[in-house]
């Protein structure tokens, strides 16, 4: 179970990306990072999300807390994978709002983990997730506005 949680975010987004690839856009926002940066950022974000979630679950003795962590974790993965599907079908408005919800969910997840009294130093490694989702929301918003 430990390795499944660690690699689940990476594998789920990788597999979803194979079935629902993100297309190229006619309009590229000026603040968009180069294409190679996306694979580096998502690899770090997904592996850190899985690794830190695994660490927190293994440190918990309370099954209710484990269940809460897993519920938020699975919901966040559902949102992140859902964006790929919506974006693939060019549902830009819906994918924009899904990114906003994903960003808020990631912040709730980080706050929940930081409320637990162990491993607080690992929370810092999750901070790129909401920042990246804010950037992705901005990029998606520009693409949505351009394609209206």
Give, region by region, the residue ranges found by the protein language model.
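N-terminal membrane topogenic signal
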Residues: 1-8
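Alpha-helical transmembrane segments of multi-pass membrane proteins
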Residues: 10-24
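Membrane-interface helix termini and inter-helical loops of multi-pass transporters
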Residues: 22-32, 60-62
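Membrane-interface loop-to-helix entry segments
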Residues: 35-47, 89-102
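Helix-adjacent hinge/juxtasegments
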Residues: 53-88
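Membrane-interface helix caps and helix-loop-helix hairpins in membrane proteins
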Residues: 63, 84-96, 115-120, 143-147
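Hydrophobic alpha-helical membrane segments
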Residues: 72-83, 95-111, 132
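Terminal transmembrane helical module of multi-pass membrane proteins
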Residues: 112-148
